[in-house]
């Protein structure tokens, strides 16, 4: 009798995706982040569901309902902080996952990569709307500033912003619709993640060398299930260290002040994982230019497969490209730092230089480095 996991219509899908999946024998820990993102998503949906049971999306009660969750609901504080810091862990894993894709040339799987870019954008939208829900000062002003950017769109901009707001300012209608979208988007993300996986399993995984591994495959279970479990344990450990010891480390103290439309905080800034894009936005003095740069800073990822000029897929044997990659990482860290600083003398010029470097590395220096390496192969 054939094993039921190979014949049952539902178990067959699980089996082909997580048990008998032929996997390259040499994939490193950089390939752990896909499963970690899945765990983060499940964790966020579960904690979010329990938070939604006690949260009210009305401007008069939103802030106090979050306080109520932390003070009066059994283990409400841990659910709330796991959700808030879970978002940070989610983005750490996302950035690592994208970085892995860039370094090892995984972007040559076009469908998988493009769905990944859509997933990144959807996750960013979800996180932004979630940040508005506690209705603190930074929630309100963050929502005001970011939605206002759409007014830079010629002709329809102002109408578009007021349509999103549901009025002439960020108010009850805005908060209610943001809650609705914040609730539904994670399920859309789940569906997209399944499509992401579907396309990945059409081609099979890439590996650190970037060379076809069809001649050397091993079953996903038990080899990579046990490896993933180690990653999950480390992820949960890091998350719980954050939640139990420094739950507000990555948050903004301004968000403990209820939203007040009459009082603007001195420094409006988003959560840390958006700071790099925020720095690029601020580095351009023109509003429309800034918005375009902001959008392009993420959408540029969709161009990466077309900028690949190297004869080799992975950067494993390409030292010049490796240097470029790590300069790009340093540049993104610089942008993240600048995004959290006030708009004054040294920071403005550093932000502008870092923004130019970001686009220059991806659009010019990396393809040039690849071409140089191609020529060096002929020597």
Swiss-Prot record:
SUPFAM superfamilies: a domain/subunit of cytochrome bc1 complex (Ubiquinol-cytochrome c reductase), Transmembrane di-heme cytochromes
Positions contributing to heme b b566 binding: 97, 196
Main subcellular localisation: mitochondrion
Recorded GO CC terms: mitochondrial inner membrane; respiratory chain complex III
Keyword Translocase recorded: no
Subcellular location: Mitochondrion inner membrane
Residues annotated as transmembrane: 33-53, 77-98, 113-133, 178-198, 226-246, 288-308, 320-340, 347-367
Pfam families: Cytochrom_B_C, Cytochrome_B
GO molecular function, one term: metal ion binding
Cofactor: heme b
Membrane topology qualifier: Multi-pass membrane protein
Assembly: The cytochrome bc1 complex contains 11 subunits: 3 respiratory subunits (MT-CYB, CYC1 and UQCRFS1), 2 core proteins (UQCRC1 and UQCRC2) and 6 low-molecular weight proteins (UQCRH/QCR6, UQCRB/QCR7, UQCRQ/QCR8, UQCR10/QCR9, UQCR11/QCR10 and a cleavage product of UQCRFS1). This cytochrome bc1 complex then forms a dimer.
Name of the gene: MT-CYB
Keywords: Electron transport, Heme, Iron, Membrane, Metal-binding, Mitochondrion, Mitochondrion inner membrane, Respiratory chain, Transmembrane, Transmembrane helix, Transport, Ubiquinone
Name of the molecule in the record: Cytochrome b
Task of the protein: Component of the ubiquinol-cytochrome c reductase complex (complex III or cytochrome b-c1 complex) that is part of the mitochondrial respiratory chain. The b-c1 complex mediates electron transfer from ubiquinol to cytochrome c. Contributes to the generation of a proton gradient across the mitochondrial membrane that is then used for ATP synthesis.
